[in-house]
């Protein structure tokens, strides 16, 4: 039988940098996992307060 592709649920979206499915930051259509986001957030223009 042919494999079906999921079109909904948590596993559909992946990090566009490393492919991880957990801890995804989807706000502002960023689609990065939290690990990748922490590494490149400053380069994207985000600033860390205190």
From Swiss-Prot:
Cofactor(s) named in the record: Zn(2+)
Keyword Metal-binding: yes
Molecular function GO terms recorded: rRNA binding; structural constituent of ribosome; zinc ion binding
Keywords: Metal-binding, Ribonucleoprotein, Ribosomal protein, RNA-binding, rRNA-binding, Zinc
Subunit organization: Part of the 30S ribosomal subunit.
Reported function: Binds 16S rRNA, required for the assembly of 30S particles.
PANTHER family in UniProt: 40S RIBOSOMAL PROTEIN S29
Protein name (record): Small ribosomal subunit protein uS14
Gene transcribed to yield this protein: rps14
């Amino acid at each position: 039988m042919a494999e079906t592709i999921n079109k909904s649920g948590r596993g559909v979206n992946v990090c566009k940098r490393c492919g991880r499915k957990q801890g995804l930051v989807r706000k502002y259509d960023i689609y990065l996992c939290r690990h990748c986001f922490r590494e490149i957030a400053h380069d994207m223009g985000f600033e860390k307060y205190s």
